């Protein structure tokens, strides 16, 4: 897949998510940011799982990386958990979020394989 198609896909996804966003919920991470956080978490989770360490060590490494991810998006773990719970109890929204996450991870994996 060409770089132009990937950029177009990401732009289109971002545009759709922003236009559908409902900002009435206070303290809930917007869908587009939640998608980005989940994508980052899944990418790092996969990378960390391939490290040659014990399971407990891998969990600790992921927990540190998770904190860095939250910090990079200026959210706390509490806000993330509250937001995830909100989306969990709104299955259509969560399905939409994860569809974009899955599509984005598929594109990421395809581009990673082409390197």
Explain the meaning of each model-derived region:
Residues 4-11:
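Sec-dependent signal peptide recognition
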Residues 16-19:
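C-terminal motif of bacterial Sec signal peptides marking the signal peptidase cleavage site
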Residues 21-24:
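Bacterial signal peptide processing site
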Residues 30-48:
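Post-signal peptide N-terminal segment of mature Sec-exported envelope proteins
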Residues 52-115:
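Compact alpha-helical subdomains of small soluble proteins
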